[in-house]
Each structure stands twice: as C-alpha cells, then as structure tokens.
Amino acid sequence: MITTEITKLQYDIYGLLAERRLKDAFGKLALLVNELQDWVSRDKLNEMETSYRYMIQYMLDGVEDPERKSIYDHLVLSAYVLTDRVSDRLAGQVSPSQYYGWKRYASASRTGISLSSQFDVCDNEINDLSLALLLGEQEQDFSKIQSLKHRIEDTAGNLFMGIWTNYPAAEEDYRSLREALFTDRFPDTFVSLLLSAVLLNLLHRFDEQKLLILLDGYRHSSPEIQMRSLCCALIVMYIYRERLPLLKSLRNRLDALCEEPRFKTDVRNIFLQFIKSQETEKITRKMNEELLPEMMKLGPSLYKKIRQEDLMNDINALEENPEWQEMLDKSGITDKLKELTDLQMEGADVFMSTFSHLKSFPFFQSIQNWFLPFNPDHTALSGVLSGKGGDTFKKMISASALLCNSDKYSFCLSLAQVPESQRDLMMGQFSAENAAVQEMEKEELMKKEISRENISNRYIQDLYRFFKLYIRRTEFTDPFAGHINLLHVSVLNPLLSDSDSLRLIGEYYFRRGYYAEALELFERLSAAYHSDSEIYQKIGFCYQKKGDYANALEAFLKAEIISPDNFWTIRRIATCYRNMKKPEMALSYYHRAEKIQPENLSVQMNIGHCYVEQKDYEEALKYYFKVDYLDPEGGKAWRPIAWCSFLVGKKEQAQRYYEKILDDKPVSLDYFNAGHVEFSLGHIRKAIDYYRRSICLLYTSPSPRDRSVS
C-alpha cells in the first residue's frame, strides 16, 4: 500500500467517525490493520467490534444502560487512536517525507536517546555558555563562545526534530515536556521554539496529552509563551474539532482557563487574527499585480517631471512638486497605498510579498529556524549587525512590531549580501547620537513590553510563512489552506457565543467580504435581537451577495417592519424584486424611495428601468429625461433615452443621443444600436459603417459590455 492510499483510507475513516458511522469505520480500519499485519492492532480492533455488537444487541433488547453514551464515545475515540497509530506505522514503512526520514535516521543513529536525555544535553550546553559569558570582556574567548552557541543551536534543532517526531509518546515524554516547558529550566526563547515543534507533532497525529500541555502553556509567566501556546492550541483544536467533544479532560481544562481574566479576550483576538491571515494572499496579489506594475509604469513619467537641476541641488524639491502627487492620485497608486497602510495598521500581513523572495537562504533550510524568536546574536547573523550603530540597530529591529520574526531574519540575512563598506555606512546612521534614533527610542517602537496582540499576530505570520513557503511544505497539514473558523469548534462555544463576540466577529467578516461566515453570525444574533433592523439589513445584504434574492428580500422586509422609512432598506427591497423579475413590486418601492429622495439619480434611473421591463417606454423616457436634466454632463441616461426613443419611433431623437454617445466613450454595442437607427432612417451606408466599427471594437476592446454583444 502506497502513501497516498494509506492517507486516503486514514481520512475516509476520520470522515466516517465524524459522522459516527462506527460499523463502516471499522470496515475501513480493518483494511489498514490487515495491511500492517500486527496482531496487537488486530486484537484491539476485534475488541472494539465485539463491544460495539454487544452494545447494539443490548439496545435492541431494550436494556437500559446509563453508561451507553460514555461507552459509545470511548469506542469512537479508540477508533480514532487506532487509526492514527496504524496509519502512522504503515506510512513509516513507505513514506519518503522529512518526518519519517528523520525518524528512520534517529532510529538508526541515536538509539536509546530519549527526550529527557536530549533536554539534559541542551541544559548542560546552555549552562556552559552562561559560564563563559560571565567572564569579563577581556577574558572572554570569542571563538569558544561562538562554538558553544553553534552547539546549542544544533542541539536545539535536534531536540525540535525529536519533539516533532515523538509519536506515539510515552508517559516519560509527557513528563519531560512539562518539566522543560514550564519549570523555568530553559530560556523563554528556547521554550517558544519548542512549542512550535509540539504544534507540528500534533498536526501530524493528534495527542490529547500534548494538547493539554499547550493549554497549560497559557499559565506561563511569559506573555510570549502564553500567546504562542494559545495560538498552537487553537489551531490544533480547529483541525481536530470533530473528536474534541469526546475529551472530558479538555473540557475541564478549558473551564479552568475561562477563570483567567484575559483568556476569553485572547481567544477572540487570535480568532480575528486568523481571519486576517485569509487576507494575506489577496494583499500579496494586489501588491504584485496592481501596485508594483503601476509604479513601474509611472517611474519614467515621474522622472521626466523632475528637473535635473532640482534633483542635483535640492532633494527636498521632490516633496514640493504638486505634479508628482497629482500623477500618483490619477494613477490610483495613492488610494492603493492608503488601503495597504490602513490594513497594516489593523495588523494585516502586508510584507508577505516583500519577504517571500528572501526565504531561500540556507538558514531557512533548517525547519526549526522558521519558528525561532528573533535573536540578533544568532550565529547566522554573526558579523552582520556589528560596527558603529549596530547595537542600536539590534534594539530597533528586535523591538519592531511591524515585522514577524521570520522576516527579521530574512532582512538581516539580506544585509549580509550588501558590501561591508555600505553596510557599515548604513549602521553608522543608527548611532546613539543620531537625533532620529533617540526620538524612536522614546516611542512605543522601542518599548520592552510588546502587546499580547502583537505577539500572537507576529507568530501567526511566522506560521503562515512556513506553511506557504517552506521548501517541503506539501508534506505538512496546512491549517491556512482553508479558513480557521473557531466558531465551528463546539468546545469553544462558551467563549465565543455571547452577543458581543458574535457581533464583533460578524462585523469583522462583513467588512472583509466574507459574507457566508458573516451571515451565519448575524442569523444567530437575530434570534436574540428581534427588533434590530441593522442585523436584518446585513442578513439581507449577505444573502444578496450570495445571489439568494428570495431570502435577501425576506430579511429586508423584516428590517422594513422595524424601520419603515429607511431609504437604504427600501432600495434594497426594490432591487431584490427587480432581480426576481417582479418589476411591478420593484416599481412601488422605487416610488417610495423617490418620495424620500426625489432627486436621487440612481432611483430615477431604476424607475425608468422598471418601466422598460414593463414595456412602458414612454413613461420610462420621462424618468430618463429627468436624470439627464439633473445631470446633463454625466451622460448616465443617454443610452436608455436613445434606445427607448428608437423603440417608440422617435428616430431623430434617438439619432441625436447616439451621436452624443459616439462622441463620448462609445463601446461596440453603441455603434451596433446606432447602426439600427441609421438603417431605419434609410442611411444604409452610415449604418454599415457603424456595424463595421461595432465589429472592430468588439474584438479589440477589453470592455465587458463589448464582450456581451458577442
């Protein structure tokens, strides 16, 4: 059995167990067990099948068993565990992945070395380095210190791999993990790294005890460890959400954590950051496909606007050139930059496109380095951040909340490619005497305490980069491949189901265009807030965005009952009726909207459209002419006036308006319709000329209006 067949069977069984189809799950599990040819697994499966048959038999006989549900849940959980273990052992025999490759290597070359022993080795090396650093600067041996740092980094890397591949774990492994992570035995940066190894281990196969260890990390004294632990735990809980209700110990642990004053707020904030991570791909695409190409096109034009003598004499003249800003405004670059700046202020990941090309350094070939908290004294950065101003630069980049840890390493490693003389010159700008640097030290950027939100946001960005950019990323379960919706994790419902949380998360989804997710929350809110018209408006809008006009109309009508004279609601109701091909009903609501805003051009146009749909062209013309009167230069009503005039036989009037259209910005359909008018007036040659132009424009214009003609 090859790896893909094993994985498919594994996830088929997961699906059956999620639906609680135990008998079918046992049948597929038997295929895996038979392939493994392991008598212990065979006996375990037989035992589960026997218990299941007895339970069914007792139920059919009408025997009341108060323990039936707990027995059933235990069977489901046991089936999950057996599936995990059997599929893991089978994959270990044939899979070429990095995970199983390391397990085979460790088994062959490091037999008998437990996690506990690896922790002891690392502890001793850290103590050796601490002793070496206690010596005065004159007595310190730089090469020895660098050698010790290298050894610690290598040992930490091996330990990371050991924790990642530690499945199935023994009781001693759980004790070692707890002692290492939560007894102040190791530095916080070291513990922070190892938490990511636990996350990767759990994404490979579920382990209840390790999930509880992650949740216990929230009680650590370090905010960095607290937030990293919680991020990891929430990702794991979402991935394995179907089996969590079976774990009583998990529910008890969550109940205890709910007593922590910040736990609920932290969970909610991390959830919002997971939602933000879904924007990263969209932002990257906008940067690469819209902003950067526009700036490249604009570059030569901007250079021409800058007089060479101004450039040479006074660089500040650039800031004073109004034509420069005007060009940026007209090109739309200013708006795009403002949008990206606003997203960055909200914590969105706007640097993914910038740093994705800087992940090919050898540093990132080691899996553990993707999760390292930034350390400017890492041996990979040796000599890069030295010289005058280097210490200040280290402080600045370490404290910066704008870059995640992975991007900070990318930035510093890219500096190593800069010639030393230029790098020293740049570092010199960050000397302590520099007034700008002194000012920055006073600002929040240089504060030692970084907000909890920043910690989790940066860590999520680190995780996102690993799962999207690591060279062997396809071997991992990518939690960011879909949307991490914690509302679908039933054990977290007590934390997220209050009205404030539902409204906050719903508005967050709504603003970002995730209408299906927003709809789910607004409908839950509507059950509690029957008299809130805004909720029904947003429910209707979400349905409308999905193209479900019947349900949208139902929601808008409820909003109308609560706020009968709301202009926005009335217009939406009319729009729904129009899309449902009910122009009579739409017309009645557009007339109501007209009474509220008699000079609203959009309303007047839509009234005209409704009359056209009813084939009342004369009445439609009245409203189109009103629009043309209120906005004579806009030209919004020219096309409907021209076409309706033609339909009612006012050919000369239609001709005049088509001439205005063709003098403005005509599309293929305009020439096509103008040709009809000229043909009806007997101007055959002119009609043929218009038809030819229509065809030419149809195949040369990117306009959707033109393409629709074909």
Feature locations, PLM:
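Conserved small/polar residues in nucleotide/adenosyl-binding loops
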Residues: Y699-D706
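Alpha-solenoid helical-repeat scaffolds
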Residues: G383-S563
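Conserved structural position within tetratricopeptide repeats
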Residues: S526-A527, L557-I561, H591-K595, F625-Y629, ...
